[in-house]
Amino acid sequence: RPVGDLYEALAVEDIQRAADALHSVYDQLQGADGYVSLEVSPYLARDTEGTIAEAQRLWKGVGRDNLMVKVPGTREGVPAIRALISQGISINVTLLFSQKMYAEVLEAYISGLETFVAGGGDPKRIASVASFFISRIDVAVDNQLDGKIASVSSDQKAHLEALKGKVAIANAKLAYQHYLKVIGSDRWKKLTAKGAQVQRLLWAS
């Protein structure tokens, strides 16, 4: 039996047990919490159709309504997210670093919900989180700042030093402002009236 198949069988069984353990939380909070996530293969991060097919298989294989399938927030992942949400599959979007990609992912969630509702689906049973990474941005930016600091004047050095460790939080604040704008829109309020859950922002390290 291929190693990949063995891994998936073990992962599915493990996730089923975790989902069962948390299902009382899921029931008590009416689907607002109590989820377990299982990710599609990272090798499919640039493959829209492959991501959709694997997410569908994992969703069916686990067979628990408190599962979220992890899908990376790549350009190819965005249409997969839209398609999967429109099919009633809850999604945990991972590896979000930029405001632009976050905005695209949030739009994919909303348009997927609209399609699901238009087909007669109940949006209350769909949940999603957007995992927006913080510290990794500062690591990358601070390294670039260090390179610049080594080659500028003393006055400029002080200015650049003051920027270290701050870019990621500023980036996250702007993403949150976009989130607030979207959930305050008439478009979103129409979905809320039908019971839709917001796509929660998850601040990741």
Predicted regions and their residues:
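Glycine-enriched alpha-helix->loop->beta-strand junction motifs that scaffold or abut catalytic
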Residues: 80-91
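Catalytic alpha/beta core domains of metabolic enzymes, predominantly
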Residues: 90-205
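Short, well-ordered coil/turn segments that N-cap beta-strands
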Residues: 30-36, 63-67, 87-89, 124-128, ...
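Active-site beta->alpha loop and helix N-cap motifs at the rims of alpha/beta catalytic domains
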Residues: 1-80
